[in-house]
Amino acid sequence: MAARLRERYEKEIRSELMKELGFANPMQAPKLEKIVVNMGLGEAINNGKIIDASVEQLSAITGQKPVVTKARKSIANFKLRQGQSIGAMVTLRGDRMYEFFDRLVSIALPRVRDFKGVSPKAFDGKGNYTLGVREQIIFPEINYDKVEKIKGMNITVVTTARNDEEGRALLRHLGMPFRQ
């Protein structure tokens, strides 16, 4: 069964975007390409167990096993060696991506303390949107009692939009709560 948000995009949102942006061909309408969830774990240099806990939490949040990112080069000031594990990331595509985006905008973001909406300025000039989450406990899949340390993550939504206006229109139609 296809993701609920994907079906809504194909049935309603794509045609609304075509009218709004003045496209004739449905393939011109912007769509989600992938979502990258990255958790940088600088403190993993001193404590290797943090990586395992974070990998477990990221896989619970995204439904996919994360890849452990390693340091590209040694930095003496940070006590960092080349090849040392310093983070975890997941790239979501297809139905998992739509399901994650749906959970993010409808369940997780409203659980952020003092949430007034996400910044409409965090686009990169090519229609992609990046947002930082300060706590992983906003996701319902995370058991608050088992969390040792509260960690944040970066969520990048990559779209096929050609510019920020198209990307903003797409995310607004998909339900992203932008600040006014």
Curated annotation (Swiss-Prot):
Top-level taxonomic group: Bacteria
Gene Ontology cellular-component terms listed: ribonucleoprotein complex; ribosome
One Pfam entry name: Ribosomal_L5
Keyword Iron: no
UniProt-listed GO biological process terms: translation
HAMAP family: Ribosomal_uL5_B
PANTHER family, sorted: 60S RIBOSOMAL PROTEIN L11-RELATED
Record-stated family: Belongs to the universal ribosomal protein uL5 family.
Function of the protein: This is one of the proteins that bind and probably mediate the attachment of the 5S RNA into the large ribosomal subunit, where it forms part of the central protuberance. In the 70S ribosome it contacts protein S13 of the 30S subunit (bridge B1b), connecting the 2 subunits; this bridge is implicated in subunit movement. Contacts the P site tRNA; the 5S rRNA and some of its associated proteins might help stabilize positioning of ribosome-bound tRNAs.
Name of the protein in its database record: Large ribosomal subunit protein uL5
